[in-house]
């Protein structure tokens, strides 16, 4: 009887430990951090104590940080030097680094994929060499600074292509050649161990869109093959389309894994604490989740469970939880942050990362 009494609590603790560490990557994108700090913003933990944001994240279960990298931004925001500085802090806090290469001087997304200044817009051979050399330069710079990189995404939300006009979706062979060149910029770099290479699309819930892109780019007759990349990343936002259900996300992730054999991650997602005037109806199987701090916890746990229950599902990243100067985060909702924008204090929802 005594043995059973002792064993049962141990089993409970073991099960809890396994449940709280089911995802390999429990992450956040905090690319804006250095810009926020330059504006005088300081962050507080849930107890109101001022601390570096990276330490607050780590204490709440975050183990990886996503960083967007721009090529030649006019003001230096998110350029290579900026990201080396941020990554050194991330590593010092004990978290891994995931670089999100935009291959642009500014935002890259389904509506914007502007080729950097000085890169070719009329010759694909020249452009692919520029992509290869730039990608290798980024990786080599991190290596020379002693910074390990866990993941490199070759493009950001590239369902509609990248590096326009040459990489528009009217020419999937060009897209494939660009991605192949980027992948080998990582592979031929001096980073050791080598990062995992990711392709990242938006609308992760839309299996037909995901399948269309990968089937076209892998059958274009160009250089890209499945062995060029390791991971498939998707964005999953609940406030842009009522069809973005959890059920649809589940189907899409499972199909991506079974069709292409890659590990899968949700690399951008958010949930609002305030959304008085949403531009679109929320998906039907999310309507029971309140727009609140508690709702953020519930939403992240549900998405994380879907990822964890997908064969090869290994990670979730929350997009910009602490960008207090941009609480809407580009959406029609008023506030998607896990840090209070007025007090700069971490909300209790931030601790959800310790549970996924």
Swiss-Prot record:
Q: Which GO terms describe its cellular component?
A: extracellular region
Q: Describe the reaction catalysed, as an equation.
A: The enzyme specifically hydrolyzes (1->4)-beta-D-galactosidic linkages in type I arabinogalactans
Key words, A-Z: Carbohydrate metabolism, Cell wall biogenesis/degradation, Glycoprotein, Glycosidase, Hydrolase, Polysaccharide degradation, Secreted, Signal
Name the InterPro entries for this protein: Glyco_hydro_53, Glycoside_hydrolase_SF
| Organism superkingdom | Eukaryota
The answer to whether keyword Hydrolase applies is: yes
Localization per Swiss-Prot or TrEMBL? Secreted
Say which enzyme class the record assigns: hydrolase
- The catalytic site is made up of 157 (proton donor), 268 (nucleophile)
Q: Where is the signal peptide?
A: 1-21
Q: Which residues are glycosylated?
A: 133
Provide the GO MF annotations for this entry: arabinogalactan endo-1,4-beta-galactosidase activity; glucosidase activity
Q: What is its EC number?
A: 3.2.1.89
Single GO biological process annotation from the record: cell wall organization
Q: Which SUPFAM superfamilies match?
A: (Trans)glycosidases
UniProt entry tagged with the keyword Isomerase: no
Q: Which family does it belong to?
A: Belongs to the glycosyl hydrolase 53 family.
**General function of this protein:** Endogalactanase involved in the degradation of plant cell wall polysaccharides, and more particularly of hairy regions of pectin.
What is the recorded name of this protein? Probable arabinogalactan endo-beta-1,4-galactanase A
The lineage, from the top, is: Eukaryota, Fungi, Dikarya, Ascomycota, Pezizomycotina
